[in-house]
């Protein structure tokens, strides 16, 4: 059971870091950085918080399989990666639980659109009002629109890069 002597073995978000990126496809740079800084051995993923806890404060490792929370219908950008895809709910974010200096640390990565939407959703349609069918429907609609805006920013980025490539090719 949880008490003041072992809380650090149970609580995975006592320390949290949120990283923002402009374009969703930049997630791979974030992922590669995390994996390069922390040992990533699936055999060390924590199943039993109390018994699987590594007491060595100098052992820095990824403690759980990284997760990508996304909505059904979102881009398949995470498919085929070494990340668990979770599609329940309206939440969008990447989650890593790492062990650092004797504590679990939650590291999240998301786009600015995802962060902006989560703040609006949290302010207007948080858990207390999710019983309201109309608010729930509008929340779902706005979440889908936010996801489309996120996708459009990536599309425009690729379009700009293609145009620059074509312009460079014609200049030769």
Enumerate the language-model features and the residues they cover.
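Long beta-strand-rich cores associated with HINT superfamily self-processing modules
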Residues: 8, 16, 20-158
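Intrinsically disordered, low-complexity acidic/polar and Pro/Ser/Thr-rich regulatory regions
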Residues: 159-172
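Phosphate/adenylate-binding "loop-and-lid" substructures adjacent to NTP/NAD/dNTP-binding pockets
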Residues: 1-15
């Amino acid at each position: 059971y949880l008490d003041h002597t072992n809380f650090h073995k149970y609580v995975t978000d006592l320390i949290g870091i949120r990283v923002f990126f402009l374009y969703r496809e930049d997630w791979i740079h974030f992922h590669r950085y995390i994996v390069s800084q922390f040992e990533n051995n699936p055999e060390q993923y924590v199943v039993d918080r109390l018994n699987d806890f590594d007491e060595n404060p100098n052992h820095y490792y990824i403690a759980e399989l990284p997760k990508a929370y996304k909505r059904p219908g979102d881009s398949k950008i995470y498919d085929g990666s070494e990340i668990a895809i979770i599609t329940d709910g309206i939440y969008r974010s990447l989650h890593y639980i790492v062990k650092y200096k004797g504590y679990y640390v939650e590291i999240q990565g998301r786009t600015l659109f995802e962060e902006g939407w989560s703040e609006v959703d949290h302010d207007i349609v948080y858990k207390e009002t999710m019983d309201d069918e109309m608010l729930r429907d509008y929340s779902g609609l706005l979440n889908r629109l936010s996801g489309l805006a996120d996708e459009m920013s990536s599309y425009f980025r690729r379009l700009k890069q293609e145009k620059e490539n074509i312009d460079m090719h014609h200049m030769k």
